[in-house]
Amino acid sequence: MKKLMMFVAFAAVCFTANAQIDSKVKDVMQKCVKAMENPAGVEYDMDFKVGMGEVSMMSCHVLASSKGNLSKAVVTAKVFGIEAKSETGFDGNEEWEWNHAPSLSADEPAKKDTVFVQKASERKKTPMDLDLDIIEQYRKATMKTDANYYVITLSNPVEQEKALPGEVVIKVYKKNYYLRELSMEQEGATISMTVTNVRTGLADDYFRFDPSHYPDAVVVRK
């Protein structure tokens, strides 16, 4: 289960050259990377789902934004029916992390939220970054097209001991090369990530840390 959750955190794909990968596949992947790293700033809505058979183990909505070195990610997750929220960000000077975990029962007292803030010169990589880099871990990639998407299938992992899925399926929009969907099976569970919306053109102020956004939280500066 730990390996499965690590892969979900890693989840999203990535695209660098591999000698055994067809040039048409590499071209689509490289264009996808360029489209998803808009220098004017890009924000994408993503839905993550992890299930075992017909049982939903985890669902997660992520609103992830980036512009150069600036970043922000707002995550709402539901694990076995329990909802939790978090937000991380870097505004060029400070990085912060806010987590909200609900009480597990009516008898449990409400927990006080905390925002941890510290000075930083550059942002740390977050679990929700679109890391666009997994193709090097696979020996084979095939591609087909339908009316709206390029559908790329990665298979035959290079290193089995890393517990990578045997097959990863990636959908990329034909019209603009935005990533649409990533799906796989891992340790008996089905994992999917779907990008539901992409917005470009973000002001720097959008990434600035503002304590007023967390009125009920304790701000702790490290």
Where are these regions (language model features)?
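Short, cysteine-centered beta-strand-loop-beta hairpins and adjacent loop/turn segments enriched
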Residues: 51-57, 79-82, 158-164
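Sec-dependent N-terminal signal peptides
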Residues: 4-15
